[in-house]
Regions:
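Signature for HUH/AEP ssDNA processing cores
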Residues: 96-169, 180-188, 305-306
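C-terminal accessory nucleic-acid interaction domains of nucleic acid-metabolism proteins
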Residues: 1-29, 33-35, 46, 50-51, ...
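Beta-sheet entry/capping signal
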Residues: 13, 53-55, 66, 163, ...
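A short beta-strand motif that forms the metal-chelation/ATP-contact edge
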Residues: 175-181, 221-225
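Polyanion/phosphate-binding surface patch
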Residues: 52-83
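Flexible loop/turn segments at secondary-structure boundaries
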Residues: 63-66, 76, 141, 173-175, ...
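Short beta-strand
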Residues: 57-59, 164-170, 211-215
């Protein structure tokens, strides 16, 4: 760290204020620890944030105190940070865009614990280039159901000839992401995702549901497809989650889901770099895929009718 509590990065000088502030009280993790994590993870993480509107999960007083969700860019953000103005109900909102390491470090200094990017990019925010399925268990002890559901989805996506990537949520669930060609709108994508998720629910309605209300889930695993909407987000790959231990949402290989010691909160800011030192990022080639929902739609209808 440079003197005067500033980090020199990307030709920028980012001041770190209150570096000793405890952000994770049960673990003694400080703001500087979070800043250092995001600075080190930036080469892996920034490619998954580039040119996407961001929603920030901020805990300036630590996760032991109430945090807040920030969509609009604060007026004091420096001019060198990229922003994008998008439509919202009744007007517009200007989001931050994280296209470089310095921006990520700056956001960490703002007490930003979690970063949640849109599923679309700034060049056309109305046409998503990612489709997401969020496997969210009702209970802490249903890892087998979460993994099983994700593997069923992978099998179905293979039949649809759609590429699929998976990551931990850093909590109890899994995110399955399909990279798209950004030619369809959000309504079309969400309808596709819902129809596909219904195939899994129809196979085992005692274990999986599309019902978002917890009291109606009756202990079942939610396959959340409602994130596939305009302005909806999910935790970014390598984002810290605001939970004790500072777990991280981590891309994993499909075969890893079957390992005995696997769990969605396995990786934290303390051990993720040991993993990356010996394992390639399973998502590193995601950008090479641009799948077509239009081409897959007839196969999906046949699959659902079977």
């Amino acid at each position: 760290m440079a003197k005067d509590n500033a980090i020199e990065i990307d030709g920028r000088s980012v001041e770190i204020t209150r570096p000793g502030k405890i952000l994770f009280p049960e673990d003694g993790i400080t703001k500087l620890d979070v800043v250092n994590y995001y600075q080190r993870i930036a080469p892996f993480m920034v490619p998954y944030l580039e040119n996407r509107p961001l929603v920030l999960q901020r805990f300036p007083d630590g996760i032991g105190r109430p945090g807040f969700i920030q969509k609009a860019v604060a007026p004091y953000y420096p001019a060198w940070i990229k922003k994008v103005t998008v439509k919202k109900a009744g007007g517009t909102v200007k989001h931050v865009v994280c296209n470089d390491d310095a921006t990520l470090v700056y956001l960490a200094n703002q007490g930003c614990i979690g970063l949640h990017p849109w599923l679309s990019r700034t060049d056309d925010v109305n046409c998503p280039d990612q489709m997401i399925f969020d496997f969210d268990p009702s209970r802490d002890d249903d890892l087998a159901g979460v993994v099983g559901g994700a593997l069923i989805l992978k099998e179905l996506l293979d039949k649809l000839e759609l590429p699929a990537f998976v990551k931990t949520t850093g909590s109890r669930g899994l995110h399955v992401v399909v990279p798209l060609d950004a030619t369809q709108d959000f309504d079309t994508m969400r309808a596709f995702a819902r129809e596909l998720a219904e195939v899994i629910v129809d196979r085992d309605s005692s274990r999986y549901t599309l019902e978002a209300h917890k009291e109606k889930r009756k202990g079942r695993i939610l396959i959340d497809v409602n994130r596939n909407g305009y302005a909806q987000t999910a935790a970014a790959a390598y984002s810290i989650r605001a939970r004790n231990g500072a777990p991280v949402s981590v891309p994993v290989g499909w075969s890893e889901l079957r390992k005995r010691n696997f769990r969605p909160n396995l990786y934290t800011i303390q051990n993720i770099f040991a993993r990356l030192d010996k394992t390639d990022d399973p998502w590193k080639d995601m950008g090479k895929f641009h799948a077509s929902l239009k081409s897959a739609a007839p196969r999906l209808h046949s699959l659902h009718a079977a």
